[in-house]
Amino acid sequence: MSGVASLAKTMENGASAEVGTTGNEGFVGLPFLLESEHAPTAVQMQVPGHALRLPARAFLGALERSQSLHRVLSRFAFALYTQTSQLVACNRFHDVEQRCARWLLMAHDRMPHDDFLLTHEVLSMMLGVRRSSVTIAAGQLSEMGLIEYRRGHVTVTDRAGLEMRACECYWSIRREYERLIGFAEKEYAD
């Protein structure tokens, strides 16, 4: 997958919030790995990209034939569970600017370049906040020179600075991904 996909939970009133993010390090379709036919979340591509698609029957057959595939995907599932757990705490304890910086870093880790398509509307849904809150937070990050935000397009201009503005959740999630699946961010120029 070359974009960023979000696992989003939609409430009865239609409001949605992100409960997990994946990109080139993972896959969507976790319920099949866990032998469930019901998905409690919807998958939404938040940053456009490409992905390979595999019929469920072929996926399940590959899992039956390969213990190593099952083991790798199970480790990813645990990494995603860790991320989801951390996001619950993050949404409770950290301010919008910190969460915005965390989300942008997580997306940046999964992208091949520093700029990507992203609207305030999408980011507000991912963070579970009002669009106006994202506009303020993104404006603050932009004023600090950490990002450039143009209509529907964000560029990370100072990754180190953005890392300093992000809450501890970014680092906690990243360390677990590195430990469990060997996922590490791309090399960044100073």
Model features per residue range: what roles?
Residues Q46-P48, L63-R130:
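Polybasic "coupling" helices that flank or enter modular domains
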Residues M106-D190:
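Phosphate-/nucleic-acid-contacting segments
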Residues S2, R57-A58, E121, A160:
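Alpha-helix/helix-capping structural signal
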Residues V4, P48-A51, H153:
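Structural motif
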Residues E12, V47-P48, R150:
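Short acidic-glycine loop/turn motifs at beta-strand connectors
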Residues M1-N13, G23-E25, V43, C100:
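Glycine- and acidic-residue-biased ligand/ion/polar-headgroup-sensing regions
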Residues A58-F59, Y81, L146-I147:
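Alpha-helical bundle regulatory/interaction domains
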Residues E18-F78, Q86:
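Cyclic-nucleotide recognition modules
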